Amino acid sequence: EAEMAALAVELLSETVRHMGFDAEVVASWQEPDADNDERYLLLDLHGRDLGALIGRRGDTLSNLQYLLRLMVNQRLHQWKNIVVDVEQYRQRRAEHLTQLALRSADQVAKSGRPLALEPMPPNERRLVHLALRDHPSVYTESSGEGERRKIQIMPKRGGG
């Protein structure tokens, strides 16, 4: 694990420096959670003006993470999950999506009308599904294709 962490920090630091950013990489091993079935390496970038590394809805961050995983896992000939974050953006986004899901569910429960959320990547749709899976008045469905795939929050019939 130490070798992987050192290599990942080195490669990520070098990559973001070549992209024109001045950022510190903080590495830590995390225990399994809702998004990860096993221990994973979290690399959190800290610095000024790093918003461009996140990109629209985290797209740039996800692409950077994908490339780093490929580079590290190919060099070490083993696969371990690596999560790249910028100043805990992913955690803040998860909290925002959970709150959005709960507010939207309340709206659907009151109105009795379905509500479609904005298109989201698979990991974000999963957070919404998990946030509402035990809700007494609504259920969720995914619809659409590819990047246009989104969640529909539907009222349960028969009062829950």
Task: Describe the residue ranges of each PLM region.
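RNA-contacting regions in translation and RNA-metabolism proteins
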Residues: 1-160
